[in-house]
Regions:
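Active-site-adjacent structural elements that line small-molecule/cofactor binding pockets in enzymes
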Residues: 1-293
Length: 293
């Protein structure tokens, strides 16, 4: 069994906006031996008291940095830690622009980007960005197909249902051709999509036992697609505040037995009040997990 790669979730909703603290966090994660930094994505937050209520946890009061911009900064102050979106809400963004941003970041980071994508829940963001919330699941497959075309070919002729590229291309192309694309989400159409075209899956389930049915489905769908688990990644998250080392060990062992190739440690929601608290937490976990640079 391969060793599971351990990363951290950047705790941006609790971290503040001090660029020096952000630099210190990224450099600490790298020096402690974590394999990657994962960040969430929301472009805008809505007023929770608006007439049509939201269905998710975040509002305009929760700070989120733009992922590509934040990672460009982190790439400049680190050397080799992987930069992972978990996830970027792809259907609310312009596909060709995402291709350009991701390719540029991959070049500037020397091939360190892993792009996790998903559909999102915040319809307000879609409206504000001029995108259709209702057909986001239909559009995302074409988006992923086009991204890979743009990342691997100097010139692209593409005509789909929602996209057309008339013999044009990106320059520079990314270091990774193509950049790995992982999917979040857990609905059955998502699981089929993951198995059909994803490089990996980022489940929201906290425990491996809760994900068993979904993992079984992905296994069947991989078989149908002529693919194998050997070429597929699995990255759950571990909540730092939900237990101590004995509990951490159980959760990690169960996920690894279920096939997890990666795991991200999330220190948000643990009662920490300062950036230093979050940095101390990832230091503590690195010591427990035996990580080393």
């Amino acid at each position: 069994m391969k060793k599971m790669l351990i990363g951290v979730v950047f705790p941006q909703t609790e971290f503040g906006i001090d660029p020096v603290a952000i630099r210190d966090y990224a450099q600490a994660a790298e020096s402690l031996g974590y394999s990657h930094i994962l960040i969430y994505d929301h472009v805008i937050g809505a007023n929770p008291e608006r007439a049509r209520t939201l269905t998710g946890p975040y509002t305009f009061k929760d700070p989120f940095f733009e992922p590509f911009v934040l990672y460009s900064y982190m790439a400049a102050v680190t050397q080799d830690i992987e930069l992972t979106t978990g996830i970027i809400i792809l259907p609310q963004r312009q596909t060709v622009l995402v291709a350009k941003q991701a390719a540029t970041l991959d070049v500037l980071s020397n091939g360190r980007l892993r792009l996790g994508v998903g559909l999102g829940w915040n319809w307000v963001e879609y409206e504000a960005l001029g995108q259709d919330f209702s057909n986001r699941g239909q559009r995302v497959e074409e988006q992923v197909d086009l991204l890979r075309e743009l990342w691997t070919k100097p010139l692209v002729k593409y005509k789909g249902r929602w996209h057309e590229v008339p013999d044009a291309g990106l320059n520079p192309l990314p270091i990774q051709r193509p950049i790995p694309i992982w999917f979040g989400g857990h609905a059955d159409p998502v699981l089929r999509r993951v198995a059909k075209m994803g490089d990996g899956w980022m489940p929201n389930y906290r425990l491996a036992a809760d994900a068993r049915q979904a993992l079984d489905k992905i296994g069947r769908y991989l078989d149908e697609a002529g693919r194998s688990w050997d070429e597929f990644g699995l990255e759950p998250r571990l909540m730092y505040g939900n237990g101590k080392p004995q509990r951490w060990a159980t959760v990690m062992e169960d996920w690894q037995a279920a096939g997890a190739t990666h795991m991200s440690i999330n220190t948000m929601g643990s009662g920490f009040r300062t950036p230093g608290d979050h940095i101390q937490a990832i230091q503590t976990f690195a010591g427990y997990a035996g990580l080393s640079k």
